[in-house]
Amino acid sequence: MADLRQLMDNEVLMAFTSYATIILTKMMFMSSATAFQRITNKVFANPEDCAGFGKGENAKKFVRTDEKVERVRRAHLNDLENIVPFLGIGLLYSLSGPDLSTALMHFRIFVGARIYHTIAYLTPLPQPNRGLAFFVGYGVTLSMAYRLLRSRLYL
């Protein structure tokens, strides 16, 4: 069984860790961006969230939806749907001994696609910008899954 020193010497795993940190930080930014939009536009999902703006009926008017808030929230949800599978499959892929340059290509394309997807979602850029960014990132995750299944797993 590999000890921690061996794992730290695994260049692919260290590259994955770096890119996973970048993409998780971006996803954390989306949480903050959603909160910022909610506070700036005084749009809240729950009555207790708007208690500082009044009580009773006065507070209820702040429990509503807003297109700006919903756009950021949907971009964040899309991150959750795509980044979580990338993290799981990417970790297994990293531990399977792939070529460093191939792994870096996967990680860089995924991170670039997700950052571009967020820009396309929040700006908003016309389609097919967002759709292409989604499918590029999704394709990278599928590519890693395919390579992992083909080379290392017993089916």
UniProtKB/Swiss-Prot annotation:
Membrane topology qualifier: Multi-pass membrane protein
GO cellular component: endoplasmic reticulum; endoplasmic reticulum membrane; membrane; mitochondrial inner membrane; mitochondrial outer membrane; mitochondrion
SUPFAM superfamilies the record matches: MAPEG domain-like (SSF161084)
Residues binding glutathione, per UniProt: R38, R73, R74, H76, E81, Y121
Keywords: Acetylation, Endoplasmic reticulum, Membrane, Mitochondrion, Mitochondrion outer membrane, Transferase, Transmembrane, Transmembrane helix
EC number in record: 2.5.1.18
Gene Ontology terms: biological process: glutathione metabolic process
PTMs per UniProt: Acetylation of Lys-42 and Lys-55 is observed in liver mitochondria from fasted mice but not from fed mice.
Transmembrane stretches, start-end: 10-33, 63-96, 100-123, 129-148
Function per UniProt: Conjugation of reduced glutathione to a wide number of exogenous and endogenous hydrophobic electrophiles.
Protein name: Microsomal glutathione S-transferase 1
Species, as recorded: Mus musculus
Name of the coding gene: Mgst1
